[in-house]
């Protein structure tokens, strides 16, 4: 193992090129080797300063620097004392900052030559150099996305962006949202100083800047420096600062997300003191977050679980990588049109079929409108847009499916209709073509009975709007082959979506679980709980949309239809149909003609533009809203527990078998609160562990019904002290 991952090369002009290249992994991260290497390199720079004219910092990896080592932040804690862990992280963080500060003040100019992605800790390293040049190459991405993991930039990112950009600019454009920017956008924001077109141009540009700026210092190390836009005590900044906590609260809707508030505090407090004191303030807030449960949850979900899935964690072994050449989409409505678009965007030829050619053309028009917007925003070029649209072929002729190797049906939700459309094309497509259905409710095994090759039939459930929603739920039927599952996972990754795999069951995983959240909220309405109280509980739990609002958007009539179909299927199988307090409320609203948002009336009233104007007073009158008072946390946890307990049942029944798939599917597919790390992580991290969760479930069951009784499998796992 090399003792130093930062190679040193000095040219005849005295310019030292430092190249970061961790020999033990594919990306550079802030692991122990980097920490030792940085310290040794800074010591050498200081010792040889008189023979150095300047320094270029670059990377041998395609990614400039991948940031902090999240494994170090989450692993190896076990039952260690919290104070011990916090002290260790504090010491490590301060050591990093000390060496970065030495780098930027050792007396010679340093320029970063950013040859790829510089996110999080990677960007923080460059902020400790006097100049930043980025290559505008594929994969180049610049930013401080720590807030999306429940963290703040702990390597000086808060302190230096505030001093570089000003408090308001740093907070609003970099820190609080954590955007990942292309190099030109990063330059516009002020995070980088120059952009070159290729990696080959980086070193010459860096050396040119060094020759022209031999005495360069950081702005904050220069005499007379003031924070751009003013310090917290200046009138212009003092005007907007008091509103920031309220703005954050409105954005978070009361959800337990501590990172944005910690970022705001670190930025403002740090701007009132010298840079060295500011970095200590930043460290304290960083450590409070990284040792907290929310960050641990979010790191697990958005880094480890997501990485597992996108690396093909649920993909069967032993099958070559598959690339779809020609995709046949049946049904050119909203879903079919959008599936055609994302497939064509990934470079695939698409046949878009409907029963009417005008309908098929309207389906293609969906892509044309999206491309018009992309052109106006500078997200694509005319040439690329024309090529994409040329790949979509609207048709009514089943014979145009000749050569299709992947079919995705998005027709009306009827077994008979779906059987019919597959019969039209089954003998036309390639003999081993994937036969996929975008159904969200119908059993895949039943649909597969309508084709000759049931082993090639599979569910490919997209979420609306397809071009924005990142998840695809892949459903295995009873006869679906591993080979077809592998193909569909490859297709999903190719269109830049995240695949989760579930087994066939009515409602699959996502639709089945989200229904319990909605039902629990609606049942509370029927109990006489104030609807606004219920909506507030949903928001403060961290759901993206409040439950009654979401019900209106999904349509109450559709909810009733799915419930009735499910009940009929359960009866046909000899099962017991269980009543729920939500059913009578939905039925009564539909009797009043209140189907939801599209009808202009549901739980809410709507104006002529479809905007909510308030909860319907008739609802309060009917159910004597406010007559029943329950603890706020009970309402929050009724919704969270309903989904979590249903997920346990899905594991028991084999509907879902992967914890990462369940966590990511719940967050990306049905809006389970991100701070929890997903529906399974919510159970694992509950206070008192699984036993604490089981005890609370019993408590909720005693108050609100037996459907909160924990499944026996969960009780047994808790008794053994295990986790999922």
How should each PLM-predicted stretch be described?
Residues 15-19, 54-58, 111-113, 133, ...:
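Structural motif
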Residues 48-51, 59-98, 118, 148-150:
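Glycine- (often His-adjacent) and acidic-residue-rich active-site loop
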Residues 99-112:
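Conserved catalytic cysteine-centered active-site region
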């Amino acid at each position: 193992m090399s003792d130093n991952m930062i190679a040193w090369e000095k040219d005849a002009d005295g310019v030292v090129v430092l190249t970061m290249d961790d020999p033990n992994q594919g990306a550079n991260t802030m692991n122990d080797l980097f920490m030792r290497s940085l310290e040794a390199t800074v010591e050498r720079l200081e010792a040889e300063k008189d023979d150095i004219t300047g320094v270029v910092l670059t990377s041998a990896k395609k990614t400039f620097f991948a940031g902090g080592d999240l494994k170090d932040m989450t692993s190896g804690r076990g039952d260690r004392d919290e104070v011990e862990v916090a002290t260790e992280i504090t010491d490590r963080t301060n050591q990093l900052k000390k060496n970065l500060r030495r780098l930027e003040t050792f007396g010679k100019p340093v320029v970063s030559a950013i040859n790829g992605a510089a996110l999080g800790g990677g960007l923080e390293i460059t902020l400790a150099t006097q100049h930043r040049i980025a290559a505008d190459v594929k994969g180049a991405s610049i930013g401080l996305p720590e807030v999306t993991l429940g963290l703040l930039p702990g390597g000086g990112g808060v302190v230096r962006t505030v001093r570089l950009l000003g408090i308001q600019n740093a907070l609003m454009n970099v820190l609080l949202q954590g955007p990942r920017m292309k190099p030109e956008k990063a330059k516009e924001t002020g995070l980088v100083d120059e952009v070159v077109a290729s990696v080959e141009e980086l070193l010459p540009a860096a050396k040119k800047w060094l020759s022209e700026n031999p005495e360069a210092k950081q702005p904050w190390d220069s005499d007379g420096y003031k924070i751009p836009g003013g310090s917290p005590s200046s009138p212009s900044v003092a005007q907007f600062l008091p509103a920031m906590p309220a703005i954050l609260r409105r954005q978070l809707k009361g959800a337990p997300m501590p990172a944005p508030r910690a970022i705001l505090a670190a930025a403002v407090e740090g701007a009132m003191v010298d840079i060295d004191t500011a970095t200590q303030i930043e460290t304290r807030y960083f450590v409070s977050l990284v040792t907290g449960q929310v960050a641990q949850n979010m790191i697990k979900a958005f880094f480890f679980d997501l990485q597992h899935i996108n690396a093909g964690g649920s993909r069967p072994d032993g099958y070559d990588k598959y690339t779809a050449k020609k995709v046949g989409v049946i049904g050119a409505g909203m879903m079919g049109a959008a599936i055609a678009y994302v497939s064509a965007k990934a470079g695939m030829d698409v046949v878009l079929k409907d029963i009417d050619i005008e309908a098929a053309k309207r389906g293609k028009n969906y892509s044309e409108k999206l491309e018009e917007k992309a052109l106006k925003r500078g997200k694509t070029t005319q040439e690329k847009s024309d090529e994409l649209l040329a790949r979509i072929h609207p048709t009514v002729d089943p014979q145009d499916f000749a050569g299709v190797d992947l079919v995705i049906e998005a027709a009306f939700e009827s077994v008979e209709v779906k059987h019919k459309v597959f019969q039209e094309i089954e003998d036309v497509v390639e003999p081993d073509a994937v036969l996929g259905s975008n159904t969200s409710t119908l059993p895949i095994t039943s649909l597969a009975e309508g084709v000759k090759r049931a082993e090639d039939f599979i569910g490919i459930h997209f979420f609306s709007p397809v071009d924005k929603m990142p998840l695809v739920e892949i459903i295995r039927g009873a006869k679906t082959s591993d080979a077809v599952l592998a193909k569909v996972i490859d297709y999903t990754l190719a269109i830049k979506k995240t695949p989760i795999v579930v087994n066939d069951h009515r409602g699959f995983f996502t639709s089945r679980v989200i229904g319990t959240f909605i039902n629990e909220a609606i049942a509370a309405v029927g109990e006489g709980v104030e609807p606004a109280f219920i909506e507030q509980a949903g928001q403060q739990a961290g759901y993206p949309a409040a439950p009654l609002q979401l019900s209106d958007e999904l349509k109450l009539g559709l909810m009733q239809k799915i419930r009735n179909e499910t009940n009929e299927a359960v009866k046909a199988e000899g099962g017991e149909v269980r009543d729920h307090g939500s059913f009578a409320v939905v039925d009564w609203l539909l009797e009043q003609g209140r189907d939801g948002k599209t009808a202009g009336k549901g739980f809410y009233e709507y104006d002529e533009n479809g905007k909510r104007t308030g909860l319907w007073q008739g609802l309060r009158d009917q159910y004597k809203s406010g007559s029943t008072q329950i603890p706020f946390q009970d309402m929050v946890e009724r919704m969270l527990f309903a989904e979590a307990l249903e997920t346990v049942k899905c594991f028991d029944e084999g509907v879902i078998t992967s914890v990462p798939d369940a966590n990511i599917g719940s967050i990306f597919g049905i809006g389970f609160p991100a701070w929890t790390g997903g529906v399974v992580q919510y159970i694992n991290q509950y206070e008192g562990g699984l036993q604490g969760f089981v005890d609370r479930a019993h408590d909720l069951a005693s108050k609100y019904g037996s459907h909160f009784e924990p499944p026996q499998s969960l009780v047994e796992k808790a008794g053994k002290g295990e986790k999922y």
